[in-house]
Amino acid sequence: MKKNILFTIAFAFLLGTTSCNDFLDNEPRGVLSETDVVTPQNVDGFVIAAYAALGNDHYDTPFSLWPYGNVRSDDAYKGGSGTNDIQTFHFFEISNNIRPDFGELDGLWYLNYVGIGRCNKAIAALNKLSDVQYPNKQKRIAEMKFVRGHFYFMLKSLFKYVPYVDESTPIEEYPNISNRAKTDQQLWDAIAADFEFASANLPATQAEVGRPKKSAAFAYLAKVRLYQAYEQ
């Protein structure tokens, strides 16, 4: 009797597992092609996604480097309830036990490249449309180059040598690009080029709050050149 019960339970389990697999393993009903997505009506979605990558967390999103700059340089205290509270930043504060495998560093690196990837995708999509199809084309490309320049500036300031990819870089080539493919000065020049384009193509004012304008691009360009001129 006991064997029959165990057999029944095992059979029911196998039947349920098979049923679940059949239920979950469905063929896609439809796939969006590039022509479906890259349209004048949809292209702003690529731009908004790039802005969204800026985030608002002060530890590992690309908008602020205070734990990696101000805390390390004695301009700010880590804070918290003790040395074990966000211990990684305590190590930055005392310049001790700093390791390259800290999750916060990896998170910052990863999220900056998520933002760069979204900017590249947006620029590539915008380039597929004509100015007639999408009158804001140049302005939106300038916005994306401004935001991409910001992401790269953050990476360059913290890591110095980073792999450089833009909208013309095939995705399959990403793993093959060395962080020494560009020299220190070439990286600064590439970042500056984005802000130069932005300063030439952004309007003096923006109707929507949060979008960069010409003066912001000039200011960021000046900041990049100052950092570039500082030997370190």
At which residue positions do the language-model features occur?
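Short coil/linker segments at helix-helix boundaries
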Residues: 161-184, 232
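Conserved, well-structured interaction surfaces
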Residues: 44-48, 52-57, 82-159, 176-189, ...
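Short linear capping/connector segments at secondary-structure termini
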Residues: 29-33, 97, 167-175
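TPR/Sel1-like alpha-solenoid repeat signature
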Residues: 145, 218-224
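Bacterial Sec-dependent N-terminal signal peptides
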Residues: 1-28
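Short coil/turn linking the two alpha-helices of tandem helical-hairpin repeats
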Residues: 156-157, 163, 206, 227-232
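Membrane-proximal, proline-rich intrinsically disordered regions
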Residues: 20-68
